[in-house]
Design a protein with these regions (language model features):
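Surface-exposed, polar/charged faces of alpha-helical domains
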Residues: 48, 52, 56-162, 166, ...
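Sec-dependent signal peptide recognition
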Residues: 2-9
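Intrinsic disorder/low-complexity detector
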Residues: 7, 25, 32-34, 93, ...
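Bacterial signal peptide processing site
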Residues: 17-19
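Post-signal peptide N-terminal segment of mature Sec-exported envelope proteins
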Residues: 23-53
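C-terminal motif of bacterial Sec signal peptides marking the signal peptidase cleavage site
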Residues: 13-15
């Protein structure tokens, strides 16, 4: 009976980790949360690459890890948007619209160019430096999240990190 209760509780909690972001999330965060369909497709692709189905425990671990990684991704994106917006004086909605894809690396120069285009003027050297630093931090955070997630999933499923990394775009990472 205890085991059954544990499994049911685990399934309920795993479902929470893969549910789309609800109230209280910013627009950028909610659009970058892995949907249950994305997570299911990712799990199916993992199973296909591995050549066998994941166990229930592996499936739950993968779902939890992907949910946690997406939260980290959203935090990195929101930090980037907040730092850049505060530096150049643009509100969150404008900055968020310029950089909607949290899971994709940004070119530092392209970020500066987009902001300058939106403002209609050149950024000061200090603002350019701050935007480039925020962009580099965001890109490094994204890379670390991707690498860490791939290594964690790989170690739990017996797959190489490179194989898991190749599947990350299915999650928006």
């Amino acid at each position: 009976m205890r085991f059954l209760s544990f499994v049911v509780l685990t399934l309920v909690l795993a479902g929470c980790a893969t549910a789309p972001a609800g109230n209280g999330s910013s627009g950028a965060a909610s659009s970058n949360t892995a949907t249950p369909t994305q997570t299911q497709s990712f799990v199916a692709a993992l199973e296909a690459k591995r050549g066998s189905a994941l166990t229930l425990a592996e499936r739950l671990q993968v779902q939890g890890l992907t949910g946690t990684a997406k939260v980290g991704l959203n935090n990195a994106q929101n930090n980037f948007l907040n730092k850049v917006g505060a530096q150049v004086g643009l509100n969150g909605a404008v900055i968020s619209a310029m950089f909607p894809e949290a899971g994709k690396p940004l070119s530092e120069n392209a970020a500066v160019a987009k902001i300058e285009s939106s403002l209609g003027k050149k950024l000061t050297v200090a603002d350019q430096t701050a935007v480039k630093a925020a962009t580099a931090l965001r890109n490094n955070s994204l890379g670390n999240l991707r690498q860490g997630l791939a290594a964690s999933i790989g170690s739990r499923t017996g797959m190489s990190t490179d194989v898991v990394l190749a599947l990350m775009p299915m999650l928006g990472l």
